[in-house]
């Protein structure tokens, strides 16, 4: 097995954060990311970057964190009791972009690395991550481009990787209490250690590097699309699903809160404005109803 290199992973993640912020900041053109470096009392720290009230991005957060501790929180050991009592290190980049224009989808991406150690035993390590897209008004060409970019990122590692990670994404980003997917999916993977370290790390890098070419063309294509109050109100309503998922189901949010993470950074993914309407149903045959019938369904996009 190739040797685990925490420093190589950390260097990559810091560089990825830089590249994503540069690309998205350039696409916005009006606002820049504000950096907030922080330390965690129990061990570790990170740097959070937030762009707010831009010309294109209403709120975007790109967070790097590297935290460690004496034992993993319950969210990490629930499915793997053999990890109980091990010290851990966790590092990753996580981002959510909430655009102003309702015709631009929200995007989320995350790549992360965990290692759990115990004296006298081999370290247990794994990678996780992925990216997913949440449109408000769907465009088929955008979703196909998103999934095609995801597929290309996975191809060097085996033809089974894209369909496996796509299905995993569809299953993970699903609001059980609403009986609907959060968006149109993408890739999701966790507990990845089936390859040696170098190959697993290369797969994580390939997926991390694919986020900007997957999202930036969609952002550029839709950011100047005309919209009115109707579209804005529907966007705010659908953002409610994002909030529900992140606070009820998201593993990263739960892990962060259980491990004593930095609350401002953990909740950075939430949109600045959102609304809930009681028992809302879109008008039949409207652009809003099209989202439910054409996009928030299980589909093979490529």
UniProtKB/Swiss-Prot annotation:
Gene Ontology biological process terms from the UniProt entry: protoporphyrinogen IX biosynthetic process
Cofactor: a divalent metal cation
Annotated site, Important for dimerization, chain positions: 177
Keyword Oxidoreductase: yes
Reactions this protein catalyses: coproporphyrinogen III + O2 + 2 H(+) = protoporphyrinogen IX + 2 CO2 + 2 H2O
PANTHER family (UniProt xref): COPROPORPHYRINOGEN III OXIDASE, MITOCHONDRIAL (PTHR10755), OXYGEN-DEPENDENT COPROPORPHYRINOGEN-III OXIDASE, MITOCHONDRIAL (PTHR10755:SF0)
Name of the molecule in the record: Oxygen-dependent coproporphyrinogen-III oxidase
Organism, scientific name: Alcanivorax borkumensis (strain ATCC 700651 / DSM 11573 / NCIMB 13689 / SK2)
């Amino acid at each position: 097995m190739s040797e685990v290199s925490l420093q190589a992973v950390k260097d990559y993640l810091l560089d990825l954060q830089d590249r994503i912020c540069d690309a998205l900041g350039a696409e916005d053109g009006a606002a820049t990311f504000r950096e907030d470096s922080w330390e965690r009392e129990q061990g570790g720290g990170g740097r959070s970057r937030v762009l707010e009230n831009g010309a294109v991005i209403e709120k975007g957060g790109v967070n790097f964190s590297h935290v460690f501790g004496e034992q993993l929180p319950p969210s990490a050991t629930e499915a793997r009791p053999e990890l109980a009592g091990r010290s851990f290190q966790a590092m990753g980049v996580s981002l959510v972009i909430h655009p102003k224009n309702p015709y631009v989808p929200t995007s989320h991406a995350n790549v992360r690395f965990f290692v759990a150690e115990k004296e006298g035993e081999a370290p247990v390590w794994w990678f996780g991550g992925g990216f997913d897209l949440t449109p408000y008004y769907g465009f088929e060409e955008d979703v196909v481009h998103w999934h095609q970019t995801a597929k290309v990122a996975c191809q060097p590692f085996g033809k089974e990787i894209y369909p496996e990670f796509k299905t995993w994404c569809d299953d993970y980003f699903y609001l059980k209490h609403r009986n609907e997917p959060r968006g149109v999916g993408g890739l999701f993977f966790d507990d990845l250690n089936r390859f040696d370290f170098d190959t697993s790390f290369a797969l994580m890098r390939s997926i991390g590097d694919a986020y900007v070419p997957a999202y930036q063309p969609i952002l550029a294509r839709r950011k100047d699309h005309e919209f009115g109050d109707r579209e804005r109100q529907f966007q705010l309503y659908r953002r409610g699903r994002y909030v529900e998922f992140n606070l009820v189901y998201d593993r990263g949010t739960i892990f962060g809160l259980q491990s004593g993470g930095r609350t401002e950074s953990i909740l950075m993914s939430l949109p600045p404005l959102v609304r809930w309407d009681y028992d809302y149903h879109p008008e039949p045959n409207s652009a809003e109803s099209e989202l439910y019938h054409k996009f928030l369904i299980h589909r093979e996009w490529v």
